[in-house]
A protein has these predicted regions:
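Cleft-lining beta-strand/loop regions that shape enzyme active-site pockets
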Residues: 1-168
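Conserved functional hotspot residues or short segments at active or partner-binding sites
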Residues: 187-204
């Protein structure tokens, strides 16, 4: 018999391009992406022989994933309590505001993995790379960093997946999937079907 193994793919890859300059790539937003990012940043800082001067965050071809992981990644670079994303929908329970606070990115009562990050990670110059394959959670991060003027966003127009979908059960074991809300960046820009427009357009 075959036993199905649990395969965990690390969604964060990082390296020092040269002393003081870091490159971080996020391939998708999984359950541990926020923790993986915190570990990567800590390692980059300890591995750099000079103070950190800049960081590239690569979200190209990142299809998205978990919303709380997008909030965690944004919170690593933004001031505490900064608005990351909000939703507007047809019903009151479809309206949410998600901020750069542990209550919005921690699942359960785990420790805050962002608490001990170097303070300069919130202020060093930063470039975020995006393209047409950057969707959903990666658009939330790019939009939040752009709106708060925390990072220059560079690349091509993102995919434009900013809808919240709810599955409503019907009779006869069937269900219908409805779009019940949309995601908006902190400055009120709808992501759905529009995407994030980079500050610097570069079609690769």
């Amino acid at each position: 018999t075959l036993v199905r193994a649990i395969i965990k793919i690390d969604s964060v890859k990082s390296k020092l391009i040269e002393p003081g300059y870091a490159y971080v790539r996020i391939t998708q937003f999984q359950e541990r992406t926020g923790e993986n990012l915190a570990e990567a940043i800590t390692k980059l800082y300890s591995g750099s022989k000079v103070p950190m001067k800049g960081l590239i965050l690569d979200l190209r071809n990142d299809p998205g994933g978990l919303l709380n992981s997008a909030v965690a990644v944004s919170a690593a670079f933004l001031p505490s309590n900064a608005l990351v994303v909000y939703t507007e929908g047809r019903t009151n329970d479809a309206k949410m505001q998600l901020r750069a606070n542990p209550e919005y990115y921690l699942r359960g009562s785990g420790r805050d993995f962002l608490a001990n990050l170097p303070q300069s990670i919130k202020t060093i110059p930063m470039v975020t790379l995006v393209n047409g394959g950057s969707a959903s959670a990666s658009e939330i991060v790019a939009g939040a960093l752009q709106d708060h003027k925390r990072s220059i966003v560079m690349g091509s127009q993102t995919f434009g997946k900013g809808s919240v979908q709810t599955i409503l059960p019907l009779s006869n074991n069937t269900a219908i999937k409805l779009t019940t809300a949309r995601y908006f960046t902190p400055n009120g820009q709808s992501i759905q079907a529009k995407g994030i427009t980079p500050d610097i357009l570069d079609e690769e």
